[in-house]
Structures are given as structure tokens and as C-alpha cells.
């Protein structure tokens, strides 16, 4: 058989389908179910199956808190059990997810060059000197990526820190008290 590549974008909510006369948008679960159907349809007929997933299914939730499921880890294990040998993704939220399938090829392509190239092409008026530009990381999880950007651009790095009031609960959540920049003042 031939090598088969499946492209599945679980974050694409623009696709719709009609269900009992109502237009529904495809959820990540719908995309993942369709991917499994396609894999089942060609299983045993291909030499090697690879899945290209720009954003991993369930990949934003990378650690278990209390009794939550780890959808991404389970999905990767399911795909491996179905015969998928390669997963290709872009900028995984937490690349440690590959530990769920240590015997399967897992390529995490970092699009940092493409991001900088597109930024410069579409905003040529930007000045990357320390007096006019700063890279801000939205949270601790993105700090390594933004450290790379600030190093390449030769500018300062800041980070949002979400200070929460843990004494109050609003709709089951702790409200954010303030956003503060850590690092040089902005």
C-alpha cells in the first residue's frame, strides 16, 4: 500500500452540517470522529498512516486537575492503536504530550520563523528597538516561545500575571484582580 496522510483541523469551527433542519458547526469532537472513520476505512490497505493536525485535539488541556480527562493523551493512544505511525502538529501547547505515545513519531513544528516573516510583511512600519517594541507573553506557558521572539528581535520581554482573589468565587471561578507586567515597565 501507499503512505496516507490525513489532515484534520479540530479547531476549524467554520465547517457546518445540517441536523434535522438546523445548521450545526463542527466541534473538535466531530472532526476527531471523522478522522477515526477515515482511518478505519483505509486500515490494512496502507503502508503507513500519518495525521497532520495543526492544533492537537484536546491539546490545550495538558495536565490533570482533580478528575478531568486527558482527551489529547487518550486520543493519541487511540490513533496509535488504530495504526497511525506519525503525528505532525504545529506549536503544541505542551510538547510533553508526546510522552503519551513514546513509540509513535511525533513532530512538533514550531512556526516562529513564519510568524515573524508574516508580521514583517504585513506591518513594515514596526520598529523593533527597545524604546518602541516589547514582546508580551500572555502566560507562563508561552514564555519560552516569547523569549525566542524577544531574543531574535533584540527587544524586551514582559509577561501577563493574573493576580486572582481566591477568597471570592463568581460563577464557580476566582475573578482576576489585575493584570500586571513583570519585567520592565511599559
Give the positions of each predicted feature.
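PRPP-associated nucleotide enzymes
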Residues: 1-186
Amino acid at each position: 500500500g501507499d503512505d496516507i496522510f490525513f489532515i484534520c483541523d479540530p479547531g476549524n469551527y467554520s465547517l457546518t452540517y445540517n441536523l434535522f433542519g438546523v445548521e450545526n458547526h463542527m466541534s473538535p469532537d466531530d472532526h476527531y470522529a471523522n478522522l477515526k472513520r477515515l482511518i478505519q476505512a483505509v486500515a490494512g490497505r496502507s503502508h503507513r498512516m500519518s495525521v497532520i493536525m495543526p492544533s492537537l485535539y484536546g491539546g490545550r488541556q495538558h495536565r490533570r486537575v482533580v478528575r478531568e480527562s486527558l482527551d489529547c493523551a487518550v486520543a493519541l493512544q487511540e490513533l496509535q492503536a488504530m495504526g497511525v505511525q506519525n503525528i505532525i502538529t504545529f506549536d503544541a501547547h505542551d510538547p510533553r504530550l508526546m510522552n503519551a505515545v513514546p513509540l509513535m513519531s511525533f513532530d512538533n513544528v514550531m512556526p516562529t520563523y513564519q510568524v515573524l516573516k508574516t508580521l514583517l510583511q504585513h506591518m513594515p512600519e514596526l520598529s523593533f528597538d527597545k524604546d518602541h517594541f516589547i514582546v508580551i507573553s500572555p502566560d507562563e506557558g508561552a514564555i519560552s516561545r516569547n523569549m525566542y521572539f524577544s531574543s531574535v528581535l533584540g527587544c524586551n520581554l514582559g509577561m501577563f500575571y493574573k493576580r486572582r482573589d481566591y477568597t471570592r468565587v463568581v460563577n464557580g471561578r476566582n475573578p482576576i484582580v489585575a493584570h500586571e507586567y513583570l519585567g520592565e515597565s511599559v
